[in-house]
């Protein structure tokens, strides 16, 4: 929550940043987050939720996410956004979505498959095309490829579903402005994932800002790049949220 505000005493519905976590087989925990506090200090509420597939809720909850990228996993996020609106917490005209890695995929999927919900979106090293993502995984993930086919989908047997849930292949549905950030040396989510998305958006005249850092991988580590990224995030949100 922004400084000085509590849920039981909101003066009006708030601008909200929906922030799906990466993984996706990880979770958001209670505790301090400098990123969340940065966003809250700028006057935004931040909504983090543990959608199906998040760890810590048992095996059944984890397995409910298998082959559900862009489907029921995304529905959980969408349901959470509708709850925020129905509860009077979120201003329905001022909801952004921002995530990294899988959270970046969920950001693109949200902007693509529920375009009416979001006024802007920030994708940080996110997957845009599930087929090319599975083709370009790093060598140290090769031993897990069969498991990834079970969890995400098989490029042959599940091709139709993977195509249907790849935002880069449905960029014509996106209406909101986007900011996309990518490391040029990302071994997990190849730079081509972001290149595809940016090219598809620009072809359709959708506003997109693209930041690429040549000396970064899967997430920025160099302080000058981290500062550049968050300054750009702040400007983008000030303009669009």
Kindly give the residue locations of the regions a language model identified.
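Short beta-strands and strand-coil junctions in structured, solvent-facing domains, enriched
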Residues: 6-7, 26, 187
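Conserved HGGG/HGGXW glycine-rich cap/lid loop of the alpha/beta-hydrolase fold
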Residues: 19, 26-29
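Short beta-strand-to-loop junctions in surface cap/lid or active-site-entrance loops
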Residues: 1-12, 166-168
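Short loop/turn elements that form and flank the Walker-type P-loop nucleotide-binding site
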Residues: 11-13, 33, 42, 174-175
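Short amphipathic alpha-helix adjacent to the substrate-entry channel of hydrolases
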Residues: 30-49
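Short beta-strand element of the alpha/beta-hydrolase
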Residues: 9-22
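Short, Asp-centered acidic motifs that coordinate Mg2+ and/or phosphate
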Residues: 15-16, 45, 120
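Active-site-proximal cap/loop segments of hydrolase catalytic domains
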Residues: 35, 48-241
